[in-house]
A protein has these predicted regions:
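Alpha-helical segment proximal to the catalytic Tyr-Lys
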Residues: 126, 168-173
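Substrate-binding pocket helix/loop in short-chain dehydrogenase/reductase
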Residues: 94-98, 102-107, 206
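Active-site helix of classical SDR
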Residues: 121, 156, 164
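C-terminal substrate-recognition "lid" of short-chain dehydrogenase/reductases
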Residues: 127, 214-242, 247
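Short, small/polar-rich loop/turn modules that mediate ligand/substrate recognition or access, typified
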Residues: 172-176, 235-237
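Short C-terminal tail/terminal secondary-structure segment
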Residues: 90, 95, 145, 226, ...
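Residue(s) in the substrate-gating loop at a strand-loop-helix junction
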Residues: 140
Length: 256
């Protein structure tokens, strides 16, 4: 047990934003729990790149797994300074096709995207309070504008935004809680969801909608998460859009 080293838990850390955030924290001296659900090999690769890190399997929809993930951090480092709730899931169903999305789909998406962050925060709360720790929830602009991969996903991220505000209010002053809201983020998750053939076309469509004319990388989202953890001591209860201006949109060509 090395209580002098700060420690962080990143859920859903085998790929994408979670992996990039794990690496970001490791380069700043954090010990990192790299949580994964299915991608053991990918998580092990991320943990190896992070140095003082461990990969821990767990489904955040299961409370016992959440408590085991928090326990792994305490066993290794004796403290939890930061929790990044990045694990997420969806059903890629066009919003025009209501009949394809059913109650079990909503239940699974909400179990991971809303109940998971709540259970992880609850499991880590006492340790976070001891060190004036930080929670960052990885939400989505979908939760504000009602777009995205499905009704279930957008609704779950809207709920996560509200959960962020509730936790920030009630865990203060010891713990800060914020959320980052990405838009389209390059990487495997969306590529697998929309299919290889459609990926570049969909990416271009989202870039055209964005005020900055581009989409984001996992590393750029990780930079924002890292700032909320290490560089924003008076920021709490905030929903930070990290979306290249997708939610803002672009003016009509005649207005530019």
């Amino acid at each position: 047990m090395a209580r002098e080293r700060k420690a962080a838990i990143v859920t859903g850390a085998a790929t994408g934003i979670g992996a990039a955030t794990s690496r970001w924290l490791a380069t700043r001296g954090y010990g990192v729990v790299v949580n994964y659900h299915r991608s053991a090999e990918a998580a092990a690769t991320v943990a190896a790149a992070c140095g003082d890190a461990i990969s821990v399997r767990g489904d955040v929809a299961r409370d016992e797994d959440c408590r085991a993930i928090a326990g792994a951090a305490l066993d290794r480092w004796g403290r939890i300074d930061a929790l990044v709730n990045c694990a997420g899931t969806t059903q890629f169903v066009p919003m025009s096709e209501l009949e394809r999305l059913n109650a079990p789909d909503f239940e699974r998406v909400f179990a991971v995207n809303v109940i998971g962050p709540y259970q992880m925060t609850r499991a880590a709360a006492a340790a976070l309070k001891e060190v004036l720790g930080v929670v960052v929830n990885v939400s989505s602009v979908s939760g504000l504008v009602g777009s995205g991969s499905s009704y279930a996903y957008a609704a779950s991220k809207g709920a996560l935004n509200t959960l962020t505000l509730s936790l920030a209010r009630n865990l203060a002053p010891e713990v800060r809680v914020n959320a980052v809201l990405p838009g389209f983020v390059e990487g495997r998750w969306i590529r697998e969801g929309v299919g290889e053939a459609a990926y570049e076309r969909v990416k271009e469509q989202w870039a055209e909608r964005a005020a900055l004319g581009r989409v984001c990388t996992p590393e750029e989202v990780a930079d924002a998460i890292g700032w909320l953890i290490t560089g924003a001591p008076v920021v709490t209860g905030q929903l930070i859009m990290v979306d290249a201006g997708i939610a803002l949109g672009r003016p009509p060509a005649v207005a530019r």
